[in-house]
Amino acid sequence: MKHRPVVLKFGTGILAREGGCSLDTTQFGRLCADIAAMSAEGIPCVVVSSAAVAAGVDALGLQKRPADLAGKQACAAVGQPALMGAYTRHLAPHGLRPAQLLLTHDDI
């Protein structure tokens, strides 16, 4: 039986530790195990993920999330590779590899 893809939205509140200043690696492990279980059942998963700013706050060694747009953009730019790295590390033990897709307005 062919399954339709399941879209999973993981927000910062789920992926980051309290305060939104770093990623919650334990939670990443659980969520990636769930993704692997669905994949093993033949259910394709598409993950829509937030938390790049939180990952960037941590990577830049900041004490708190910036309030201004430029600060948030800088954190997101630095944090996006770290976020993908977290998915890579937690999916690899399950034989899975993440891929990033950047959508344009025309894709939606």
Which ranges hold each PLM region?
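Nucleotide/pyrophosphate-binding catalytic subdomain
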Residues: 1-108
